[in-house]
């Protein structure tokens, strides 16, 4: 049967849920017509039988059976009883995996505010009520009264805050024999906030604000725009303002807050169970106090404690004292589970592990081409294993997959030859987190290398914002031919020379490369070894350096072809000295070069340089010619 979860979806939208919607999440009608879903007891499991308590946080009637196709009392076992509701325990016989998605709810004896909307930045409750956050907090946590209806009292105004003493004085005036005060209403706690929110007509308020914004300026205008934006968002999403005050709390499925038995008979439980237990205990106590008509001060204190328990459940530590468990460790609330790097979204939903991917430390690979990366053999054989197996079978080296896997495990020589064939022309994608722009993922042609580190060309580092101080990168293999061609045509590093954000080159030499270029071309008068020598070609000079006959920075003379023009840093046209040879030719000495001329024609020329500059020039020349 196709369930709604089988359907594909494009995005997840988080919004306010109405009390009716929360009840719908948790309320279910069993095949026998019984309606279940409300969690009324704080118990989890029975300490003797180790079975979930009925109507508790792990109730099988509400959330489904703990064991596949078995009811709580054990009357029905086996799959043939599918869909039957046990007459004794009321548990529906079904799969235990339903406990991963079936929810419950807690009906609160008094409404409470949602701490995200009260203490968030900005505080939507204070913006919507147009009251300072401190005043709203005083009302919610039973420190001050708020005027809901001033009646005919001239000294009272709508939404005015009153202390306990002020309200007692007004009460005495109201109940005096000669009192003319009528219609005065005050409130306290989340009930008062709920009443104020219900009295706001969002459409009318939005129109009034638009009119005021036109006439206002400065700080007041900015405040009005802020409030209008919040109201418009409420209207656009179809949410009611009073939904920010909760009268029903959802209980997440029990398998998402499990209780696990440890060695020695002890139990490890999710922190959420403790937080839910606090809410249920306080809620049940408040219900009993209301039933026996307890004094208002006691009821009010219990309502405040219920508000604090729900705050801790939703976001522990956001307001007031943090609820702690054993060893003074703060309990993880619903917000803690969702938010942050280790939260449900970033860790589990966005950060899923995928097949055909690997991860390793990056090191510099200066001998690579810009479109190449060094892939460790150990990683490559694992990532390309299906391709290698297919190729081994196709070549007739092995007959089946099992034999191919054994051959790979042995490290047979044939495997490495086949791997070389497979990776030729098969690009891989390298990604460095955080992927802040599209150049955070680029394609490269893999080159097999020894060791366990991925080699990266230094020129692509700025695009990845990578350095070699321990950074790690992920490797992904495009599988289909379409993905491979897309990676080759669009994502190959040599096609991503310019930054898509600025249009400027993002591939530019930096750090080690600039230092290396400087070192090669620098002059050092102290480098005397081999200084003043003559070399017929660049290769001769480099060979002499390799043999240790000349220093890298020693000043030497290099013979150049006659037609080649020599450019120097400073003007070098002035002849410093001339020398006439017996054959009639003339040596002309300049600052950085010298030429031999006969009959007005140059027959040979030399330039003063260093071996480092020769190496630099030769490298650049070869790169340009190729």
From Swiss-Prot:
The keyword Zinc applies. Pfam families: RNA_pol_Rpb1_1, RNA_pol_Rpb1_2, RNA_pol_Rpb1_3. It is an enzyme of class 2 (transferase). GO terms for molecular function: DNA binding; DNA-directed RNA polymerase activity; magnesium ion binding; zinc ion binding. Binds 1 Mg(2+) ion per subunit. Binds 1 Zn(2+) ion per subunit. GO terms for cellular component: DNA-directed RNA polymerase complex. It catalyses: RNA(n) + a ribonucleoside 5'-triphosphate = RNA(n+1) + diphosphate. In cyanobacteria the RNAP catalytic core is composed of 2 alpha, 1 beta, 1 beta', 1 gamma and 1 omega subunit. When a sigma factor is associated with the core the holoenzyme is formed, which can initiate transcription. This is DNA-directed RNA polymerase subunit gamma. It comes from Microcystis aeruginosa (strain NIES-843 / IAM M-2473). The gene is rpoC1.
